[in-house]
């Protein structure tokens, strides 16, 4: 139960509550510079967080075989089962013991952290579409505040307030409260702040509060992924005080923090952004941003050419900027246009390597597009929620505010790059590849209005499990098979936890899907309801295990990584076609729901897959799906809608329409 609720808290992206009532303000504390003033220091719990457990090898093998069962025929399953037995008693046992020993020697981190960073940073595929997702903000409830200049100014100020609050250790620690009446109180916070940090987690645990890992937060700002041959580098320069702004492919910088570390006045930021928006320069012939969409080794070589061509200092300004603000010159037409714009755009007005891009369209539609190597969205989601809350509830300017009378032509620096013929050729080649890839991507969206979380909970069913069941039914209806499915689950309850995989395709979802899709007339509504209940119970178990670090994917990944690192012949288990198949995730899924979130999306993780972003709200279910040319996203969504209609019919005791 605890794990399930924890998962709802961070993986589902519930809105972060307001900061605790402040301590008496000390001299020099300026409230307008900060989002909140937490009684408990931001990183108070970090030292005492529990360590990510390494599952028992026998549990991992059992879970792995359970996940393989719906994907394999009897002959394939017997072969995989035999390989698992050999692995468990042979080389797998040795590797597991080595992993446990290594973990005991590295108590400052988790067993997955290093290998997971390596996995991302050694990947040579472009970051855009292959790794970077986006989350879009809901519009400001006050429509006049959705003006592009107004919203860009307010969101920028709120973002810098977050930065200052985080670095001053004044941001509320990320904690999930099972009993907020006891733990989310001033009384408890005043007590726990005096408990030494190496014991503080235990103090919170005693009142059913669960602090979460916040180690990824320091990479939010002033950070960029730098392309390097073979393995990229994560770069952070927290001394830099300037913002990077992209518009029409041009690069601009100006300081958002003064020399004393105070936020530049909102009216000055407004003036500088207005100045940038009024720049009528034509788009550059060779937009540099395309290079961040390239294969990482090609980009590394071209970046070296940029550096040796006299652009090192200018590139340094891009890399060290607090973040990248992208101002687009067009309004958003609909959800599909929004998804294409925020997931990839036209390639000219994003710096895909930046820890995050804050994108604001002409009509004020806003989104965060983020690079994935540095973190898993835990920090991004907290930042996202806080920026939305602050910019809508305590905006720095109003639509009537006048920009400061300041000389923006001096304060704003336009960055110019010296491009050799080789670099121009490289940019043109990158554009060609980017355009071709984007052209092959389709995105479509549905909103199922018949019901959502409230109805499903009344039926005592997990809303997430029912959404996942709908995807299984839809794929079976469309393509006639059950395939490898991935749902991400945060393990932020542990020090340096990353993610674990929930495997939603199970023998229960397969049985239930076949009943609904292939022979619904054979079963009564009651029998179908019982099948759905079994799916829900099992999905809850998988979710609970994953959140507690008790999945199988990360453990097997770490064992495989260890074998490769130590030059050991790759165990047969990892050469089994079934292992490759279960890691070829045709259905890759992720869910978010928050008062701040409008919609999110990512591209398929394999060429013949679907990328499924979904949200189960109180009274509706939204689903945003991406696909390349070998799959039909529109048809898949029609099948999802049919699945949901059938499920709701069964839950209401009606016959399933064939």
Swiss-Prot record:
One Pfam family assigned to this protein is Carn_acyltransf
Q: Which residues lie on this side of the membrane: Mitochondrial matrix?
A: 26-178, 209-658
Single Gene Ontology BP annotation: fatty acid beta-oxidation
Swiss-Prot/TrEMBL keywords: Acetylation, Acyltransferase, Fatty acid metabolism, Lipid metabolism, Membrane, Mitochondrion, Mitochondrion inner membrane, Transferase, Transit peptide, Transport
What Enzyme Commission number(s) appear in the record? 2.3.1.21
Q: Which residues lie within the membrane without crossing it?
A: 179-208
Q: Which InterPro entries match?
A: Carn_acyl_trans (IPR000542), Carn_acyl_trans_N (IPR042572), CAT-like_dom_sf (IPR023213), Cho/carn_acyl_trans (IPR039551), Cho/carn_acyl_trans_2 (IPR042231)
Superkingdom of source: Eukaryota
Name the Gene3D superfamilies on file: 1.20.1280.180, Chloramphenicol acetyltransferase-like domain (3.30.559.10), Choline/Carnitine o-acyltransferase (1.10.275.20), Choline/Carnitine o-acyltransferase, domain 2 (3.30.559.70)
Q: Which GO terms describe its cellular component?
A: mitochondrial inner membrane; mitochondrion
- Catalysed reaction(s)? (R)-carnitine + hexadecanoyl-CoA = O-hexadecanoyl-(R)-carnitine + CoA; octanoyl-CoA + (R)-carnitine = O-octanoyl-(R)-carnitine + CoA; decanoyl-CoA + (R)-carnitine = O-decanoyl-(R)-carnitine + CoA; dodecanoyl-CoA + (R)-carnitine = O-dodecanoyl-R-carnitine + CoA
Q: Which residues carry this modification: N6-acetyllysine?
A: 79, 239, 418, 510
Q: How does it sit in the membrane?
A: Peripheral membrane protein
| Transit peptide start and end | 1-25
Give the metabolic or biological pathway.
Lipid metabolism; fatty acid beta-oxidation
Q: Which family does it belong to?
A: Belongs to the carnitine/choline acetyltransferase family.
Question: What function does the entry list?
Answer: Involved in the intramitochondrial synthesis of acylcarnitines from accumulated acyl-CoA metabolites. Reconverts acylcarnitines back into the respective acyl-CoA esters that can then undergo beta-oxidation, an essential step for the mitochondrial uptake of long-chain fatty acids and their subsequent beta-oxidation in the mitochondrion. Active with medium (C8-C12) and long-chain (C14-C18) acyl-CoA esters.
Q: Output this protein's name.
A: Carnitine O-palmitoyltransferase 2, mitochondrial
């Amino acid at each position: 139960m605890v794990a399930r609720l924890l998962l709802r808290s961070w993986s589902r992206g519930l809105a972060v509550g307001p900061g605790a009532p402040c301590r008496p303000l000390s001299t020099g504390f300026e409230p307008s510079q900060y989002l909140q003033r937490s009684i408990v220091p931001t990183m108070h719990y970090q030292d005492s967080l529990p360590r990510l457990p390494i599952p028992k090898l026998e549990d991992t093998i059992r879970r792995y075989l359970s996940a393989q069962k719906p994907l394999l025929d009897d002959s394939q399953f017997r072969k995989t089962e035999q390989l698992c037995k050999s692995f468990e008693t042979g080389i797998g046992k040795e590797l597991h013991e080595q992993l446990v020993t290594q973990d005991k020697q590295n108590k400052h981190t988790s067993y997955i952290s290093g290998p997971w960073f390596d996995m991302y940073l050694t990947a040579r595929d472009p970051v855009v579409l292959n790794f970077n997702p986006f989350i879009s903000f809901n519009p400001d409830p006050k429509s006049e505040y959705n003006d592009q200049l107004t919203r860009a100014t307010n969101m920028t100020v709120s973002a810098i307030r977050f930065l200052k609050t985080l670095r001053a250790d004044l941001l509320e620690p990320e904690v999930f409260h099972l009993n907020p009446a006891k733990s989310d109180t001033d009384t408890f916070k005043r007590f726990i702040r005096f408990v030494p940090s190496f014991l503080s987690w235990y103090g919170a645990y005693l009142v059913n509060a669960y602090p979460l890992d916040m180690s990824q937060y320091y990479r939010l700002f002033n950070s960029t992924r730098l392309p390097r041959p073979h393995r990229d580098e994560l770069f952070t320069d927290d001394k830099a005080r300037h913002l990077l702004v992209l518009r029409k492919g041009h690069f601009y910088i100006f300081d958002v923090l003064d020399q004393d570390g105070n936020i530049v006045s909102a009216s000055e930021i407004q003036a500088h952004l207005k100045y940038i928006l009024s720049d009528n320069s034509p788009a550059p012939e060779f937009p540099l941003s395309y290079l961040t969409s390239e294969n990482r080794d090609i980009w590394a070589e071209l970046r070296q050419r940029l550096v040796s061509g006299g652009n090192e200092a200018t590139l340094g300004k891009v890399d060290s900027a607090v973040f990248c603000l992208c101002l687009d010159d067009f309004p958003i037409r609909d959800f599909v246009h929004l998804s294409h714009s925020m997931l990839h755009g036209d390639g000219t007005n994003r710096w895909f390597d930046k820890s995050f891009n804050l994108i604001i369209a002409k009509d004020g539609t806003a989104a965060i597009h983020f690079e994935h190597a540095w973190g898993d969205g835990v920090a991004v989601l907290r930042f996202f929620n806080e920026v939305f809350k602050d910019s809508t509830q305590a905006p720095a300017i109003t639509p009537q505010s006048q920009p400061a009378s300041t000389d923006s032509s001096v304060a704003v620096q336009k960055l110019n790059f010296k491009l050799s013929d080789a670099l121009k050729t490289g940019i043109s080649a990158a554009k060609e590849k980017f355009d071709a890839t984007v052209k092959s991507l389709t995105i479509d969206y549905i909103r199922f209005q018949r019901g959502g979380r409230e109805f499903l909970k009344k039926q005592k069913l997990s809303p997430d499990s029912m959404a996942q069941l709908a995807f299984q039914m839809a794929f079976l209806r469309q393509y006639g098979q059950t395939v490898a499915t991935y749902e991400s689950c945060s393990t932020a309850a542990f020090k340096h936890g990353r993610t674990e995989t929930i495997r939603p395709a199970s023998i229960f979802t397969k049985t239930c899907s076949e009943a609904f899709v292939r022979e619904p007339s054979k079963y009564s509504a009651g029998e179908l309801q019982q099948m759905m209940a079994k799916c829900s119970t099992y999905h809850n178990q998988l979710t609970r295990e994953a959140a507690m670090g008790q999945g199988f994917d990360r453990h097997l990944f770490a064992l495989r990584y260890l074998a490769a690192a130590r030059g050991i012949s790759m165990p047969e288990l990892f050469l089994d076609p079934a292992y490759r198949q279960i890691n070829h995730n045709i259905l890759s899924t992720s869910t978010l729901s928050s008062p701040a979130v409008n919609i999110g999306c990512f591209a398929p993780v394999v060429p013949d897959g679907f990328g499924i972003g979904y949200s189960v709200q109180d009274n509706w279910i939204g689903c945003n799906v991406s696909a390349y040319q070998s799959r039909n996203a529109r048809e898949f969504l029609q099948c999802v809608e049919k699945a949901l209609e059938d499920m709701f019919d069964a839950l209401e005791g009606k016959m399933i329409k064939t």
